[in-house]
Amino acid sequence: MLRWLIGGGREPQGLAEKAALQTIGEDQGQNPYTELLVLEAHRDIVRFLVRLDDFRFASAGDDGIIVVWNAQTGEKLLELRGHTQKITAVIAFPPLDSCEASSQLLLTASADRTVGVWDCDTGRQIQRVTCFQSTVKCLTVLQRLDIWLSGGSDLGVWNRKLDLLCKTSHLSDTGISALVEIPGNCVAAAVGRELIIFRLVTPTEELPEWDIIEVKRLLDHQDNILSLANINDTGFVTGSHVGELLIWDALDWTVQACERTFWSPTAQLDAQQEIKLFQKQNDISINHFTCDEENIFAAVGRGLYVYNLQLKRVIACQKTAHDSNILHIDKLPNRQLISCSEDGAVRMWEVREKQQLAAEPVPTGFFNMWGFGRVNKQASQPVKKQEENVTTCSLELIGDLIGHSSSVEMFLYFEDHGLVTCSADHLIILWKNGERESGVRSLKLFQKLEENGDLYPESP
């Protein structure tokens, strides 16, 4: 186990970022992750981490290898080989009944146009599905129906026995980029800038075969959809490459709230202008969502935004949370948020309430605090003035985990075992709660001394 010496801030990549980027010094009292364990097994970018159970996870990336790890000790348990190109999607497929004796499966899609199905307990490849016409970019499990979906240039429906139950016709050469399950035996699929709703028809006595039907195509986005996530049983959210965020009703598929930050290039641009516009577009790309019962947390370019569902407005934002694009975020207990970025950093944030004065400017830009949630609001309609004192929140940096030397692709949180991060530097880091680990080591030493009779030596 290595000891992590918490350093000061990193030097930002440019002077503009240096002024805006929030930093933290050596005093990181709310950051428990003071020890780290470096795990080495991959030979290329590690892009995916998936939780298998409370003590195991799997990693996969561009080397085509899948590795199963012990989240507590960092021990490599299994190495799964079978793909010839990079992994493009990974998902766990647990038994329908948690009491079943059958093993949990792991599904892995690859650029070699195959999907591997693995036994997580033995590492055996159960089957390699090879009938795909294009690369499968996303996998989704519908646990209730005990089936899984593969999204590529078409959408396929499969059972646990790996039978192809049904599939759609060719949808797009670019393929399905994201899938979520929504009520009514439906799924929402992001295909370019389109959101397509499909309904699954389950077998009956009259119709014994499975079927999948395209119900509706929604064209509300102006550019490619990058992120798609469920909010709750009645709503889901999508985000696009040009900063459009739409909240949808999961039952009738109508837009319930929207915010657009348009990017309109002029007809003629020189090379320098094109670079600047490209940078601007990246700054507003909605790269990832996570949600809880109260808020939507959005990674927008290099920034973080917290949108409250009840208040229908942004309650906190950190416009420059990282030096580069944020790739993954997740909400932790105790109002904490973790983000990882192309800048190689993993940062911990806390949502804190504060009293905003009337004179203090309201955050604008990506989210419009007043227009958000009012789909039919006319531009000429007067904006309601802010009350004298509005309780809002701030995102405060409470931890900066510096260990990777390249882009951090994603992370997993284990309540009992710490944080796991994967990176383009080919490494996985298991971040440990230093205080807890010290206590565990002391307890083991105490037990060892007691077993050897050295704890209470007899008097001469």
UniProtKB/Swiss-Prot annotation:
Subcellular location: Cytoplasm
Disulphide linkage map: none
Keywords tagged on the record: Autophagy, Cytoplasm, Repeat, WD repeat
Transferase is among the record's keywords: no
GO-annotated biological processes: autophagy; negative regulation of exocytosis; negative regulation of immune response; regulation of autophagy
Pfam family, one: Beta-prop_WDR41
GO molecular function: GTPase activator activity; guanyl-nucleotide exchange factor activity
Assembly, per entry: Component of the C9orf72-SMCR8 complex, at least composed of C9orf72, SMCR8 and WDR41. The complex is formed of two protomers, each individually consisting of one molecule each of C9orf72, SMCR8 and WDR41. The protomers homodimerize via an interaction between C9orf72 (via C-terminus) and SMCR8 (via N-terminus). Within each protomer SMCR8 (via DENN domain) acts as a bridging protein between WDR41 (via C-terminus and N-terminus) and C9orf72 (via C-terminus). The C9orf72-SMCR8 complex associates with the ULK1/ATG1 kinase complex.
Protein's name in the database: WD repeat-containing protein 41
Annotated source species: Mus musculus
Lineage: Eukaryota, Metazoa, Chordata, Craniata, Vertebrata
